[in-house]
Each structure stands twice: as structure tokens, then as C-alpha cells.
Amino acid sequence: ELEVTLNDNRKFPAKIIGADPTTDIALIKIEATDLPTIPFGDSEKLKVGEWVLAVGNPFNLTSTVTAGIVRARSRGNSGAGGKDRSKIESFIQTDAAVNPGNSGGALVNTKGELVGINTAIYSETGNFAGYSFAVPISIAGKVANDLKQFGTVQRAVLGVLIQDPQYVPDAEKEKVKVFEGAYVGGFAERSSAKEAGIEKGDVIVAVNGVKIKFHGTNRHDSDPVTGFAISLAQIKK
């Protein structure tokens, strides 16, 4: 059983609508009225150096707020959060202090808008060591909507092995015509992209009209939905 305690100490039994281990996000439902809400910000507009606030309950110290700045956007996993998080390529990295009990708490901008969900730290001790990570609200929002509509997160697979075009092997680099996008280094055993004519050495520069920068920028906007056709823009090798 799951019980939710609100800031005014009201308690409600909660029903789990769905959960997504990859993002460590669950959608729950309670039967209640007069619930406050928080406005959503645009995590895609966050800038490196911008101030943010992390809200949570570290070490059971309720309603703790820490401040920091955005250190990086679209940060890869880098070992934070365990193997399930390796599929997330768009963490917001901050230096706001995050400790056990902060996970699931809000990351807000200076306008009080929700821009991320605090989820992990990079530490050898288990406590804050200067680096914390949050799932951008643009991804968390998609996860919540999918859980509400389908019960699970809808993730389609193109079956391509990609890498940053700037770091392809020297023998292949002279064939690369653009250096922003996703370089196709190979294919999975079953690949819808290969069947559609994508070739090894191509650079995918947009999905459904959304420009791609390597390592997850705009990844959530361009995520294909299972069962629907998508449009790829690529530069041929």
C-alpha cells in the first residue's frame, strides 16, 4: 500500500497508475480536492550558469531547499543512477546539493517553475560530492502522459548504433559531411532504419523535423511513438 502525506499533513491512500524504471518516475493518483499545482517551465531553454533550486527531504529534513547553477545540459549517464538510467542521455547537471531523500523532488528555476525532477548524484560515498542530476521536465512530462494514457512509456526503436560525428574513427572522418547530428556506425539485428534505406556512415540530422544534436538534446521531442511512421532527415555518406 502507498500513502501520500501532503504539506498540510493530510494523508491519502494512493494508486500507482504506472512506473518507469528508466527515468525513475512513477505516476500516482489520490482522491483529493484543493490541491496546489506548480507551473511547468521549459527545460529546453535552461542555460548553463542559470540559477536553479532543488527542493526535497534529505535525511528526513522536510522542505529543504538548496541552490546551485546549471553546470551542463543533455549530460549523459556517466554512471549516475545505475544501469537502468544508461538510456537517459539528457540529464540536467547542477551543483545544487542533493542527498538521499532529494530524489523525486523538484528542480525549479528562479521563477518558481518546475524544470526537472532530481534523481541522482555522482558520488563515491553516497552523499553529495558536487554533482547532481535531474530529469528534464520535458522528458518527465512525456513519461507522465504516457503512463496516464498507456500505462507504460512508449519507446520505439530504430535499431541504429549512433555516435557523435566529431568522434568517428579517423579513417571514416574524411567521409563525414556534417558534424552535428547522429553518426550511424552500425545497426541492430533488426533495424527499421536500415530497411528504410539508412546506411552506415550516414548522419541523421533531424527526426520528425526536430533538429538533433548528439547526446540527447531534443531527444524527447523527436522520440518516435510505437506504431506510427516517422520522418528522418539524413546526410548521405
How should each PLM-predicted stretch be described?
Residues 1-199, 206-237:
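Serine-dependent protease modules
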